């Protein structure tokens, strides 16, 4: 019981009571922790303001958008003021605006001293929120560290994407592969991993190759994830 009182959980599914109001969902959950009603009431007011749902206090849950339900589920997980909050895929299914609002709320929790444990398939989410992360493949840990340290260890500084007309890439694949320390030839584009994007682009053009489009970007955690786990879809 003592450990549970310091722990908050946000499941992947928003298992809220659809027939109850936003306020009543939080009140009922607070009672599970045997908190006095006065304490719960004060906490609800704080949490609704924190997750930007104050004006939805009297609304039934089934009238809320997906993003609002997700924020309410997080508020519910915080009702007992936990020191540790566990979140399972916190932004799955949300639009970009709702995701960024949620990230902002979670970042503020970190600033307040709450420890977050997050499972996610969104690498940009892990890069935004995590101080330390574990990448797993087939139930095994394949890498561990801070987002920046993993990127520096497993990916060169930049990635250049070259797109060629249909049928051309297959013919020039071998020539492309030797123009950077590491490369990937995909169905629709070639990815060249390099520490100097401009130099790599110059090498490609010097070879007489004429891509339709060229995109240079910094390496990301997603590049690391794909390198360590592969691009083949697995169950």
Positions of predicted regions on the chain:
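Conserved ABC ATPase "signature" region
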Residues: 27, 31, 38-56
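Conserved catalytic motifs of ABC-family nucleotide-binding domains
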Residues: 81
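Conserved ABC ATPase signature
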Residues: 60-64
């Amino acid at each position: 019981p003592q450990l549970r009182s310091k722990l908050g959980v946000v499941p992947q599914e928003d298992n809220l009571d659809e027939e109850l109001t936003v306020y009543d969902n939080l009140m009922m959950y607070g009672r599970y922790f045997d908190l006095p009603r006065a304490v719960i009431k004060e906490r609800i007011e704080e949490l609704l303001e924190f997750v930007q749902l104050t004006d939805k206090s009297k609304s039934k849950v089934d009238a809320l958008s997906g993003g609002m339900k997700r924020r309410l589920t997080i508020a519910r997980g915080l009702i007992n003021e936990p020191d540790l909050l566990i979140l399972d895929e916190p932004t799955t299914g949300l639009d970009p605006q709702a995701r960024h609002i949620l990230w902002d709320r979670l970042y503020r929790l970190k600033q307040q001293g709450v420890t977050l444990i997050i499972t996610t398939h969104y690498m940009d989410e892990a890069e935004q929120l995590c101080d330390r992360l574990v990448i797993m493949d087939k139930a095994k840990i394949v890498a561990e560290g801070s987002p920046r340290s993993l990127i520096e260890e497993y990916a060169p500084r930049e990635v250049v994407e070259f797109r060629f007309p249909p049928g051309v890439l297959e013919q020039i694949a071998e020539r492309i592969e030797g123009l950077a320390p590491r490369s990937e030839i995909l169905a629709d584009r070639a990815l060249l991993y390099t520490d100097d994007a401009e130099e790599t682009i110059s090498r490609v053009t010097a070879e007489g190759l004429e891509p339709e489009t060229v995109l240079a970007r910094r390496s990301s955690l997603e590049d690391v994830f794909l390198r360590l786990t592969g691009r083949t879809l697995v169950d």
